[in-house]
Amino acid sequence: MDESNQQQRARRYEAIHNVLFVVETVYTLGLLVAFLYWEGSDVLADIVRSVSVNPWIHVAIYGVVVVVATKLFFLPLNYFGDYYLEHKFGLSNEGLGAWALDELKSLALNLALGVPILDVLYFVLRRAGEWLWIGAGLLFLAFGVVMSALFPVLILPLFYKLQPLENESLRQKLTALAQRVGAKVLGVYRMDMSEKTKKANAAFAGLGRTKRIILADTLLDKFAEDEIEVVMAHEMGHYQHGDITKMIAWGTMTTFIGLKMADLGLHWGMARLGYGHVWDIAAFPLLALCLFVFGLVAMPLNNAFSRSREWKADAAALKLTANRDAFIRAMRKLADQNLADLSPHPVVEFLLHDHPSLARRIAWAERWQEN
């Protein structure tokens, strides 16, 4: 299939995903508002209070019900976006049973992580008084750092098989590249993504002693070694520029602002909805609504910051490898294999994309000179 036809398919794929994003956003807002105004949250809170007088148990039971209900409510949209659409565009290798198993794993993970975090969050709300937004922000900061460290060793293996890379030549090249940016890596791993998808990916994942290089088999099988090297050089550019720390700092700042806005929204809404305290679990949909709306408003700013770091990482990749041709080839292959729109509408890119468009990255690389 020639590039023009592939890009036509990519634009259709992008357009459908953009519509799906709008549908999911409206659907989420509708569910939260309905849960509040139809008093579903009040009924659920009354039920959990009848089970125990312990507030930790109240929040835990409420959290389990909400997590399971959310998964069920979004199952049709998840099926359409993650299974049907991927198969329709020839991107998925995953059977329905395997997809359903991944959904169950995702549910179990949300329960295992989300419910304890919700319990600790409401403990902070009960104890922190007017400084609750600072306490909650510190909680989310700690959670983000821990998850960044544990992701490659605990979370990723739940969904993908990981094994040490057998290509010794490539392993040595990537390890040497990591040493050049001052990164110590535990190892280089091959990730069996082809069981689920035809898309290619790579990551420089983990923190400290969990940091490792991860390469999808779909990347290893389709890309030349110099192309893989430049893709990983981009990821290592993030490390070289301290982007993990900067992204955590940026995320912490926006989280604090979001939680402060949510605190104001909670106090404004509680009086109108009849809730007495911010730690009333029945008011959770109001808290979620405030955070969700802030997230939507802040998304373009967050994406702009992310895109600025991606440009820096691209520059680092070209400086580290001095291989502009491999960079351009890799970008074009990623667009083709992942069915990415090379030139999304500028408004769509500004609002929804955390990476610059591949066409702009390629054009920039074509103009790049090492000095």
Model-predicted regions and their roles:
Residues 1-278, 292, 297-371:
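Polar-ligand-bearing catalytic/cofactor-coordination segments
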Residues 286-290:
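Alpha-helical transmembrane segments
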